[in-house]
Amino acid sequence: LPGKVLLNAGGKALLAYHIERLQWSGYPVIVATTTEKSDDIIVEFCEQHRLPYFRGDEQNVLSRFYECALHFGLSVIVRVTSDCPLIDGTLIKNAIDAYLLAGNLQIYASNCLVRTYPRGLDFEVFSMTLLEEANKKASLPSQKEHVTPYLYQNKSANTILKHITNQQDNSQFRITLDTIEDYQLIKILIEDYQAAILPTSAIIEVLTQHPELQAINAHIEQKKI
C-alpha cells in the first residue's frame, strides 16, 4: 500500500498515531528511514514533529538499523515496523523493563515468534551487542531486509530467545497496515471507536463485539519472510 504511513484518519497521519502510542513507553522514539527521495516526506514529517530520525540503505535494513543505533549511541534497541499505527507502547514498556531486569545482553525478546497478540502490535527487544553481530555475520538477503532473522533463527549460539506472550490468544485479529482493507479497518477504529487512545485490550473488545469489523480484513494472508 504506497505511502501508507502518511494516510489520514481522523485528521492526522497514521504515522502520528504510531509515534504517539510508542511514546506511551516513556522511551525515545527514532525513525529509521531511507536515503531515497521518496522518503523525503517522512523526513519532513519528523522535522515538523521534532522527531529524531536517521537515513540509511533502503534494501539492507539491517545495516540501516545498525548505523542508526551507532549514530545515536544506543545500547538496547526496540524494533517496530511502520505498519503498526495502533501498537501499544505500554506493552513495550513492560517488555523493556523485564529485559533490563534480566540484565543479559544475549536475550532477544519478541512478541511475534509465538503469536498471541493481534498482528500489528509486533516488537522486538535486543542489545547493540546482538545487532552488531547480526550486522557483521548475516549473509542472506532476507536476513538483511528483515533485520532480525539472523538472531531468532538462532544462527548465533549466543542468542537466548525470550517469547513475550499474552494470557489469551488474540492472534486472529489483524490491526496492521498492509492493504486497503487494513486501512479501512484502522480508519473506522480510530474515527468511530477512538482506538488511537485505547489500550490493546479495549481495541480487542471492540473487534470482539463487532465481528463485521474483523471481517473487513480477515481474508488477508500475511506475507511470509
Predicted regions and their residues:
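N-terminal glycine-rich phosphate-binding loop and ensuing alpha1 helix
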Residues: L1-T33, S38
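Structural signal for conserved beta-strand scaffold positions within catalytic alpha/beta enzyme cores
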Residues: N8, R55, R79, S110-N111, ...
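Anion (oxyanion) recognition and catalysis
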Residues: Q23, E47, K155
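Short loop/turn motifs at secondary-structure junctions
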Residues: S25, G73, N104-L105
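Conserved core of the sugar-phosphate nucleotidyltransferase
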Residues: V29, E44, I87-F173, Q184, ...
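Short phosphate-binding loop-to-helix
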Residues: E36-L101
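Short, conserved phosphate/pyrophosphate- and ester-handling motifs at nucleotide-, phospho-/glycolipid
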Residues: T179
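Polar, enzyme-active/binding microenvironments
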Residues: A196
